[in-house]
Amino acid sequence: MSIWQNIFCVITSPKYGWEVINESNIPTGKVMHAAYVPLLCVLALSCFVPMFYDRTISFSYSLLTGIGMFFSYYLSYYIIMCLMSSFYPELVKTEGATARLSDYILYNLIFLVLLMILRKLLPDDFTPVLFLMLYLPWMAYQGTEHLFVKKEKVMKFFAVSSLLLLILPIALQYFFDLVII
């Protein structure tokens, strides 16, 4: 299957999607460069859309917001990868295990990036889009089998990974907003 089919599968049916991702053996670098980074570019470009329906938003504000959003999600991947591999060193003992952890983080972040793109394209702060972020923990929980997390560590891993995936990009975005804007 292609990367985009994997993304669709993991979003629509996480349990099946993680199985498909496991079987597809698409290298993490390819997912990063063919899907994640292009989606981050679309996210950055979507920051210009509010200029069309709100005349008070300037080009420079949109540009800085786009740069901040791009880097907040881009850095989130690497920070979460470092934190998860230090919290759970057994998940990065082999190259295959490291690739699965990378896929787990990437596909979950791709879901969040798609939500942020949708949010930026809507003319108003449409709160139900933010509630869709609560679907991420379900996707993350279903992905624990993909990573072969031991049964006794599933809930702790699920809680830590869900919190990192949800909070870190938002915290970095807030930081960039304070520093840049």
Predicted regions and their residues:
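Hydrophobic alpha-helical transmembrane segments and adjacent short intramembrane/lumenal linkers
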Residues: 85-87, 91-170
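Selected alpha-helical membrane-embedding segments in polytopic membrane proteins
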Residues: 2-96
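Membrane-helix interface and helix-disruption motif detector
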Residues: 56-61, 123-127, 181
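Intrinsically disordered, low-complexity regions enriched in small/polar residues
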Residues: 38, 76, 137, 180-181
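Juxtamembrane boundary at the C-terminal end of a transmembrane helix
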Residues: 168-181
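Generic detector of short alpha-helix boundary/capping microenvironments
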Residues: 1-2, 132
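Short, intrinsically disordered/low-complexity patches at protein termini
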Residues: 43, 52-53, 136, 178-181
